[in-house]
């Protein structure tokens, strides 16, 4: 994030103004030492008093990502990255979720979506893919609890409450503000047919009016968008249960395809101030991607393809009933762009994307994908003024 920084390994109680920067390699040496100690001395998963306490596998996952960054400076770290995460994959303590489970198993949905639903996210709740789940306790059950916590739901869930005919509900992710939108690259070009990660349960593209007793006569324009009655090419009566028809301008923050991982609804807080469900920080799906990247960096493209295919076996499992072999990748398809695309497919809205792009030295190129290009014609939303020498590092706080 910052490049060379002052390295402080002992606490101090006296203000100092004479700090000087230490080289990244020197700082990395201390990070490496700390990670090795953590991987050896933290408890194994399930041994801590509380399941949310850190364990060896959390340290291994963190080490894998840190070593991949260090490997861009010293290639010997790529082998260390692979060695760090492999015990998570082979240790028998985790498994990719590939079947319905938990409290919503009888409801419409799919097994990938089950992982991200309130009450399904912890290992004790059946999520054996979870490595580290940051537990968000329901504040009204905690003496002195606060709701001033992460805002992911308000960021990622569109502002459906602005649509006539919609009411806040768990089925639509609660009340959002639509602060973030996935790019057109993700919406229209990232996913292949049959990928469960792009199902309507996971990237919601279609909705239905859910307000009880809703009925309204409206106009529809030549493009199929909602307009006032008698202002379009025809009138229709919309009712509860009909598919939502947006206004043309609603795609800014009211209605657009969005990941559903952060949706949740607390009926005692209809306004939906903050996140009430758990926060997935590390899971086995990313472990395979970290190892695939480490293998690719060592020239083992077949090993990288094997790891990615494990994820794709899960993602295309149902679709392969009608299209055998769908989603399979081969070694000659593997490069860093493919791995970054697969990270987006698997980890959309979960990973810190900027940090991933900075550590892979791809921010300058990949950020261009965010310049919205419509399916038919380019827009004028082009990112300009980017300087990789300046904009990949942050000022020291």
Where are these regions (language model features)?
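Extended, hydrophobic/aromatic-rich amphipathic alpha-helical segments that build helical scaffolds
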Residues: 1-9, 24-42, 51-89, 132, ...
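Conserved, well-structured interaction surfaces
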Residues: 1-2, 18, 22-29, 35-48, ...
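Short, mixed-charge aromatic SLiMs
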Residues: 16-19, 87-97, 312-321
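Long, intrinsically disordered, low-complexity segments
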Residues: 30-32, 105-175, 271-281, 305-308, ...
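Surface-exposed patches in mature extracellular/periplasmic domains of secreted proteins
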Residues: 44-51, 77, 96-101, 320-324
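An aromatic- and glycine-enriched ligand-binding surface/loop that stacks and positions planar moieties
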Residues: 68-232
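C-terminal substrate/ligand-recognition segments
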Residues: 183-313
